């Protein structure tokens, strides 16, 4: 199955973590980049388009600034990123030029993808670069981004970029062999999981947390990234990037890492954008009856099923939909503001106009704007 799936891949996103990209001194490892460039050149020669999502700017800047530890404050991180980004791209240019490949730097913030027009512009730029045979190297714009516009980590960014460029595969190169049944660093009985059909809550709970001393993402963020892409019908593989030609071997179908199979029913591009790209502005808590109707029958969310409103949001905002236990199970675009929802919650749709003095529609969230997670 793995080989057959990979034969169909014509465009792939490769995410490279700081723990893979950096050497023992904390700076960018030129030998790794040379090996990566050779493998990307091989894939390009076979007709596969490659988009790289690369960490490493902060790590490169930290080395240049002589910082002993990973920067902790936002100004320190932004200063390190400002110094390190040019060094990172210079290292990519030097490595890839040896194989007659050109690279292009793309810096993104979450707002670039949350805004639909800027999303389309970014996609157009990337499509043009790929058509010209240029390898895009994408990173978060750490020098200017603030917390509310952050992707969170480059694992999440790589999942959103996969949707942005309509790639058929996401490859996450990390410093561990893949997803294990338990943390292999602490449990000698942990075994590698070669294939995952569905990302369950049990898998998410067992994924653990923190990243390395040079990166921000642990296995939990990689699992979350895989979950995002499989919901749009795209496969993902998490594998160790430091092995011998592992990128080429994975693309040839060798049994390395953990393969996440695409979901049977995939989200369309718009619903994927709603579910994973827009940052939620608030939450709506529904009762058990509404949860069942939404989950099992794919209906719209009516005001009668709403128990509580959390946060302040305007009409047209993305909101989380929580069950009575506070567990998020859906996201959607609301047709009413938080103040309006607060007034009409628990009431029938026929009462909306009498309460508010106007009526946008019967639904607080229409089913076309609602995504089950």
Curated annotation (Swiss-Prot):
**Domain (PUA): residue spans on this chain:** 281-359
Give the PROSITE patterns listed for this entry. Answer: GLUTAMATE_5_KINASE (PS00902), PUA (PS50890)
The pathway entry for this protein reads as: Amino-acid biosynthesis; L-proline biosynthesis; L-glutamate 5-semialdehyde from L-glutamate: step 1/2
The molecular function terms in GO held by this entry are: ATP binding; glutamate 5-kinase activity; RNA binding
Enzyme Commission identifier(s)? 2.7.2.11
Q: Tell me which residues bind substrate.
A: 55, 142, 154
Q: What's the top EC group for this one? A: transferase
Q: Which domain of life is it from?
A: Bacteria
Residues the entry annotates as binding ATP: 15, 174-175, 216-222
Q: Which UniProt keywords apply?
A: Amino-acid biosynthesis, ATP-binding, Cytoplasm, Kinase, Nucleotide-binding, Proline biosynthesis, Transferase
| Gene Ontology BP term (one) | L-proline biosynthetic process
SMART domains linked: PUA (SM00359)
Reaction(s) catalysed by this chain's protein: L-glutamate + ATP = L-glutamyl 5-phosphate + ADP
| GO CC annotations on file | cytosol
Family matches, as Gene3D superfamilies = Acetylglutamate kinase-like, PUA domain
Q: Which InterPro entries does the annotation name? A: AceGlu_kinase-like_sf, Asp/Glu/Uridylate_kinase, G5K_ProB, Glu/AcGlu_kinase, Glu_5kinase, Glu_5kinase/COase_Synthase, Glutamate_5-kinase_CS, PUA
Where is the protein found, in the record's own terms?
Cytoplasm
**PANTHER family cross-referenced by the UniProt entry:** GLUTAMATE 5-KINASE, ISOPENTENYL PHOSPHATE KINASE
Question: Entry's HAMAP family?
Answer: ProB
Instruction: State the protein's purpose.
Output: Catalyzes the transfer of a phosphate group to glutamate to form L-glutamate 5-phosphate.
Q: In which family does this protein belong, per the annotation?
A: Belongs to the glutamate 5-kinase family.
Identification of the protein by name = Glutamate 5-kinase
């Amino acid at each position: 199955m793995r080989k057959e799936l990979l034969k169909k891949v014509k465009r792939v996103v490769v995410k490279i973590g700081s723990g893979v990209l950096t050497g023992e001194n904390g700076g960018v490892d030129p030998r790794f980049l040379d090996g990566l460039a050779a493998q990307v050149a091989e894939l390009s020669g076979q007709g596969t388009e490659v988009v790289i999502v690369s960490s490493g700017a902060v790590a490169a800047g930290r080395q240049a600034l002589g910082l002993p530890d990973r920067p902790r404050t936002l100004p320190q991180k932004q200063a390190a990123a400002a110094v390190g980004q040019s060094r990172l791209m210079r290292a990519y240019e030097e490595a890839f030029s040896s194989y007659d490949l050109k690279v292009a730097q793309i810096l993104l913030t979450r707002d670039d993808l949350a805004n639909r027009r800027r999303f389309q512009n970014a996609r157009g730029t990337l499509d043009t670069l790929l058509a010209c045979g240029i390898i895009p190297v994408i990173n978060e714009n750490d020098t200017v981004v603030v917390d509310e516009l952050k992707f969170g980590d480059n694992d999440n960014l790589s999942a959103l970029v996969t949707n942005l460029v309509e790639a058929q595969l996401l490859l996450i190169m990390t410093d561990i062999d893949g997803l294990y049944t338990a943390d292999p660093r602490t449990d000698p009985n942990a075994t590698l999981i070669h294939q995952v059909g569905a990302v369950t809550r049990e898998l998410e709970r067992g994924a653990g947390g923190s990243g390395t001393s040079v990166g921000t993402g642990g296995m939990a963020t990689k699992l979350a990234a895989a979950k995002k892409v499989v919901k749009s019908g795209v496969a993902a593989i998490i594998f160790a990037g430091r092995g011998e030609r592992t990128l080429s071997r994975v693309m040839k179908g060798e049994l390395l890492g953990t393969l996440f199979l695409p979901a049977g029913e995939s989200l369309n591009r718009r619903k994927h954008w709603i579910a994973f790209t827009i940052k939620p502005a608030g939450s709506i808590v529904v009762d058990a009856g509404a949860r069942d109707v939404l989950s099992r029958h794919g209906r719209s969310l009516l005001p009668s099923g709403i128990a509580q409103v959390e946060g302040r949001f305007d009409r047209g905002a993305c909101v989380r939909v929580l069950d009575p236990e506070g567990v998020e199970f859906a996201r959607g675009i609301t047709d009413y503001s938080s103040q309006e929802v607060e007034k009409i919650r628990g009431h029938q749709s026929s009462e909306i106009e009498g309460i508010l003095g106007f009526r946008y529609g019967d639904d607080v969230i229409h089913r076309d704007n609602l995504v089950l997670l």
